[in-house]
């Protein structure tokens, strides 16, 4: 779903992605992507940002319920490192619709690095004078991302981020399934 946010229906990458979907989609009047649903026995098209907002609302409600209804209004979201400005704006629109104040949209691998750095720095495990470079790898469902970060005590600097689109966990799953199918075919002629 997140790969569709902030993109146009006519985008060739979106069209390729939609081939994998089990539900019906449509182009919106503004060119965006809509999800077709049945509501009160009528087909309705909902913008993908609204669907994402529904998911964020549910997440907020679950967190509130687990925390004695303490109330969550602020959120920091991690998105793939290759997200465009339009995609990030789509995520921000979804937050707005869900009545969440998005403080930051961060790259997923940078968010991982930040978490790692805070933990290690709090335990004083970084040198005050020598730099330590750490590589963070995210094999997501649809992309493969690598970020290299330089750390010193109470210091973090992202050196580089590389993203390979179209190489993710689902591609490995497909390769394994294809291999098993071919093995089965060759042994069961």
What do the predicted segments below correspond to?
Residues 2-16, 24-28, 40-49, 54, ...:
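Oxyanion-binding/catalytic loops of NTP- or PPi-dependent enzymes
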Residues 21:
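Internal, Lys/Arg-enriched amphipathic helical interaction segments that engage polyanionic partners
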Residues 32-38:
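Short polybasic amphipathic segments
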